[in-house]
Structures are given as structure tokens and as C-alpha cells.
Amino acid sequence: MELELKPGTTSANLYQTNTAKERYYCNFGLQRKHEHSVESAGVTISGIDTPAEARENKVDSPGSIFEPRNHPYFFGTLFIPQIVSTKEKPHPIVTGFVAVARIKQAALTR
């Protein structure tokens, strides 16, 4: 499924683009009527399904990547990044997590 990534978000920075393709294994999603509540609670909806790619039974559900503001690295996704990640070509979210973990570990061992 094609996703539009919000520029300037951690998601867009990790993918190094404003669009991405992901595979879904669910029909769940955020209902548009709750979008404002999520955003006002400090969570950015940083990846949005493109309308032409709507999943079966998915009703009015735009959000596919969620990230809290003011957190070094946390994601909620409706897809499973590790499923398509391989040793030869790791998923951007997986490599980003490893990079942040290394920085954190280095800070703890100083």
C-alpha cells in the first residue's frame, strides 16, 4: 500500500522520502473522527494511506504511522516493518531503531 509521509517527521526522515510502500496484514485503522483527538494528545499521524490504496473493510481510516512528539524514537504502525526487513536490506524503521539504541547505549557507558 502506498503511504504519504508527513515532511519533517521521523518517519519521512527515516525513509528519506515523502512516500513509501508497505504491506498490511490487517483491516484496522484510525477513524477520521478521532484524528484531532490523537493529534491534540501529542501524537503525530506521520504516515497516511493514499485513498486509491484503501484496504478492504477499512472505513475512513487515514493513519498508518503514528509517532509521539518529543520522544527520541517510538512508532505505532498498522504494518509490520520487520516482516520485509532482511539482513541485506533492513527496513528503515528497524535501522532507525538500532541507530537510536546504539546512541543510547553509548551515552550510558560514558
Task: Give names to the regions the model predicted.
Residues 1-110:
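Amide-donor transfer/coupling interface in amidating biosynthetic enzymes
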